[in-house]
Amino acid sequence: MIKYLKSRLNIIIVKCILGIIILSLVFGTINNYFNRDTTRYIAKVNGEEISFITLQKMYIDERKKQEKILGQDFEKIKKNKKFKEETYNYILSQLINNILLEQYTKRMNFNIQDNEIKKIIFNIPIFQENNEFNKKKYLNYLSSKNLTHYEYVSLIRKKLNTTYLINAISETDFILDNEQKKIIKLLSEKRIIKKAIIKINPIINNQKVTEKEINNYFDQHKNEFYTPEKFKISYIQLKPNKFKIQCSNEEIKNWYKKNIDKYSNQERRQYSIIQTKTKNEALSILSELKKGEDFSKIAKEKSIDPFSSEQGGNIGWITKNFVPNEIKIANLEKIDQISNIIKFNNNFLIIKLNKILPKKYKKISEVSDLIENEIKYQKSLNTYKKLKDKIAIIAKKNINRFDLILKKTNILPKETNWFDKDSVPKELQNPILKKIIFKKGLLDRQKKLKSHSGLIVLNDHQSFLLSIKNFQKKRIKKLKDIKRNIVNKLKYIKAVEKTKNKLKKILFQLKIGNEHILKKENIIFEEYETVSRYDKNPNISVIFAMPHPKEEKNVYTMYQNKNKNFVIALLDKVYNEKFSNEEEKIIIKYLEKNNIDVTFQCFLQNLHRKATILYNKTDNF
């Protein structure tokens, strides 16, 4: 029992997650049966149609799910064309995958027994009354969906076949021993290397750049050299926490009296239980308890609940509002009162009320600071709403008179410094505000401090009124202002090209065994170091792409590191460091789980390759 109470929430969460997975992948096409539309279809999968209505309904459902998950962020992207297209394509691909899986199970003659389907139907909550199957409810449901009993059974069989197929694929999470050994060997590999660093800055400083090269680069890259449009904004910002609000002791007292239930510890009750497998066992125990036998002793000896039995049946303190229904129906109101036998799942309970901690009200002195904050917040919210409504009315009447709005409301505006898209002030870092500022036509850029945005009401009780104080157009920079940048860029390009060509020649000499070139070019290697695939080094893939050294012949490569310097790497030795048994198990487990997804995707890709899928043009979806 106690295990059941503690794990109830986790079970619900797990069931929800599994439900979402199954519904999104397996039961997606159920609307094909409930919304038969033979006039319009979106796609045909091996001759089987996906109706326009099915896709439309699932698209709407998916958008609702997105809104729940994303919350306020959904408003920012819901009209985005790319986002809508991605949602549409995702739904359509899921529907196609569903049909391909159903068709595959049909070809493979997957078959679910009738008695299994009967159990499922009998246990569906919407067909039950008083925890028992209700035939009338079932038939009414079929009638509402325009289905016969046999069609519904066929539909469930088809969906369950698909579910079993997915489960079968997910259970093939093994990796062959030979594959395991290869992967473990690969992951455990270590390499001993030496590096010689050729610094780029001295080479950059030695490069020469002509005026012609500078002019040509400027002409070819003009779009990279411009000053973005810039703004100075004058604005009104309304937020409840910006108002200076006072609160008297009298207000605190009145608030406390009106809301006293908020400032109390809820009643708590302590219960003990005895859980049995059969009703006869429960009756026998209840008879003993009525004769005065010790509840705690019997719970330890005879209760089958593994958690509470060790505590003499005690399941701890429970706040009155959260007492489970199994205990509520016992209707225990007196200390030491014992319930009758209560059916619980397939078992039986006897419950005892041990103690009651009555509701306790906190003193006003304990909660006065909390109440003061609540009053101030409520008053500031009221002040905010009144001022917001006042400004909204004045702004509507004075469309091109930001200055007049300030005068009538007696508000001093805030003003920003110059900013562009990459340096928006913190107060204006809101997608809606940024759109109004930067999108042409939403704010008049000519009527400075006259035109305004109208009152913009954001979430979290925040409002803005914006006006442009000053504006600079986007313009190409003059060559004289960016000449130094171009010179540095060209010097760097030349230095990189020159260094690459030189190092390629050096590597060629090293490859044919001429290691004297290192001394000639004054290339000095650092100390040996050991590297693994897990090192946080952006160039680690280059090191592990080097071939293994053979017959004591050194292997070399080159790359550019994060500091832009060039590196010649010498691979001296390759060896494997043995993992512990525990580490190997963790790696294999991870690979197996990853393998499920890869297997399933490959399976779907194979079904797609063999299928004939025709798409119908959809305008104004």
From Swiss-Prot:
Residue ranges of every copy of the PpiC domain listed in the record: 228-355
Membrane topology: Single-pass type II membrane protein
One cellular component (GO) term of this entry: plasma membrane
Keyword set includes Cell inner membrane: yes
Residue intervals on the Cytoplasmic side: 1-10
Keyword Membrane appears in the UniProt entry: yes
Primary localization: membrane
Membrane-spanning segments: 11-31
Residues spanning the signal sequence: none
Record key words, sorted: Cell inner membrane, Cell membrane, Chaperone, Membrane, Transmembrane, Transmembrane helix
Domain of life of the organism encoding this protein: Bacteria
A GO molecular-function annotation: peptidyl-prolyl cis-trans isomerase activity
InterPro entries, per the entry: PPIase_dom_sf, PPIase_PpiC, PpiD_chaperone, Trigger_fact/SurA_dom_sf
Gene3D superfamilies in the cross-refs: 3.10.50.40, Porin chaperone SurA, peptide-binding domain (1.10.4030.10)
Pfam families recorded: Rotamase_2, SurA_N_3
Assembly behavior: Interacts with the SecYEG translocon. Binds to the lateral gate of SecY. Forms a complex with YfgM.
Family to which the UniProt record says this protein belongs: Belongs to the PpiD chaperone family.
Free-text function comment from the UniProt entry: Chaperone that functions as a gatekeeper on the periplasmic side of the SecYEG translocon. Facilitates the translocation of precursor proteins across SecYEG by interacting with the translocating substrate. Also plays a role in the release of newly synthesized secreted proteins at the periplasmic exit site of the Sec translocon.
Protein known as: Periplasmic chaperone PpiD
Gene for this chain: ppiD
